[in-house]
UniProtKB/Swiss-Prot annotation:
Identification of the protein by name: Large ribosomal subunit protein uL22c
Gene Ontology molecular-function annotations: rRNA binding; structural constituent of ribosome
GO cellular component: chloroplast; large ribosomal subunit
Source species: Olimarabidopsis pumila (Dwarf rocket)
Domain of life: Eukaryota
UniProt-listed GO biological process terms: translation
Transcription among keywords: no
Keywords of the record: Chloroplast, Plastid, Ribonucleoprotein, Ribosomal protein, RNA-binding, rRNA-binding
Compartment list: Plastid, Chloroplast
């Protein structure tokens, strides 16, 4: 079996919430509203939506932004939610006691939520660099960047 290695992404940061006691369907309704939005806009949307599932997702988005600013030094104004997914977790099965010694099963569903934030300032800098390279005459100016004095140190290898 061939394993593919993931390339390290220098512009993305994630936060993962596991075993959140909420149905995956209800969490997806909230996640679909914030996917692709900026960080600050997503926080405003999550604060104003009237669903119970907004609070754990709000905490995850906030945690992902804290990871971005602390671990990688990104600014929160440049962050965008690039990927937000909800997966089904384990189902906790309980028994509820009923009359005459009977019991009814209760299924408590959980979900796993992943929030990935990307820094868009990196892409803007990259696009500016590409525009710079497309300008006429800029490639010829940058060709003479090698310093030949570093290669000719006067050692054994310079003798003919």
């Amino acid at each position: 079996m061939i394993k593919k290695r993931k390339k390290k992404s220098y512009t993305s940061v994630y936060a993962l919430g596991q075993y959140i006691s909420m149905s995956a369907h209800k969490a997806r309704r909230v996640i679909d509203q914030i996917r692709g939005r900026s960080y600050e806009e997503a926080l405003m949307i999550l604060e104003l939506m009237p669903y119970r599932g907004c609070y754990p997702i709000f905490k995850l988005v906030y945690s992902a932004a804290a990871n971005a600013s602390h671990n990688k030094g990104f600014k929160e104004t440049n962050l965008v939610i690039s990927k937000a997914e909800v997966n089904q977790g384990n189902t906790v099965k309980k028994l509820k006691p009923r009359a005459r010694g009977r019991s009814y099963p209760i299924k408590r569903s959980t979900c796993h939520i992943t929030i990935v934030l990307e820094d868009i300032s990196f892409y803007q800098q990259y696009e500016e660099y590409l525009m710079y390279l497309k300008k006429p005459g800029c490639r010829n100016e940058n060709r003479n960047l090698t310093c030949y004095d570093t290669y000719s140190s006067g050692g054994l290898w310079d003798k003919k």
